[in-house]
């Protein structure tokens, strides 16, 4: 069964592929279905955390994608190695503190002098701040979804519709 992947999912898979290729080049460890085991897991973890200086959440995202590919490959009979199913082959993550801009910081951004090309980007950024939307949802704002007293938008990340009141 074929499913359509979102742009961000494709991007994450491509980033994982590129990271694996860089890992091979940097360490000499050849990545294949047969070589993905707990030794790979530990070396890849050290590479992500120490060599690339990325977070544990980035490592967790890469492992989640690798496990997803291995599950599919096992399901269709291409992969026979089941090391990735062991307890130690975990998708790690840690809670992050949400970061946000204060009202004063948003106001400062609004009054900062910028050249014309950055000025438009800033205006879009501020609009999205005031609407409480992600920057990726900007293309979804059209005349068709702006009503008398609200804006209805199908959000890209969650694929759910939100209705934003206009005051």
Predicted regions: what they are:
Residues 8, 16-23, 29, 39, ...:
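N-terminal DNA-binding recognition helix of tyrosine site-specific recombinases/integrases
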Residues 38, 111, 140:
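Phosphate-coordinating loops and pocket residues in cytosolic domains that bind phosphorylated ligands
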Residues 1-5, 9:
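N-terminal helical hairpins
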Residues 46, 68, 125-129:
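Contiguous, well-ordered alpha-helical segments that form the cores/surfaces of helical PPI scaffolds
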Residues 3, 31-34, 52, 99, ...:
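Helix-turn-helix-type domain boundary/helix-start signal
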Residues 56, 60, 75, 79-135, ...:
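Basic, Lys/Arg- and aromatic-enriched nucleic-acid-binding interface segment
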Residues 87, 131, 140-167:
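Conserved tyrosine-mediated DNA breakage-rejoining catalytic core shared by Y-recombinases
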């Amino acid at each position: 069964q074929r499913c359509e992947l979102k742009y961000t999912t494709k991007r994450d898979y491509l980033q994982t592929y590129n990271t694996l290729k860089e890992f091979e080049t940097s360490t000499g460890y050849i990545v294949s279905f047969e070589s993905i085991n707990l030794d790979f897991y530990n070396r890849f973890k050290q590479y992500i955390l120490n060599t690339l200086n990325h977070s544990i959440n980035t490592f967790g995202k890469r492992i989640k994608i690798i496990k997803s590919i291995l599950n599919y490959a096992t399901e269709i009979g291409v992969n026979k190695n089941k090391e990735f199913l062991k307890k130690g082959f975990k998708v790690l993550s840690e809670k992050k503190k949400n970061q946000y801009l204060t009202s004063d910081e948003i106001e400062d951004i609004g009054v900062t002098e910028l050249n014309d090309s950055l000025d438009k980007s800033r205006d879009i950024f501020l609009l999205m701040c005031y609407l409480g939307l992600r920057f990726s949802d900007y293309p979804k704002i059209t005349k068709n979804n702006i009503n008398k007293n609200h804006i209805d938008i199908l959000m890209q990340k969650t694929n759910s519709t939100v209705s934003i009141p206009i005051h």
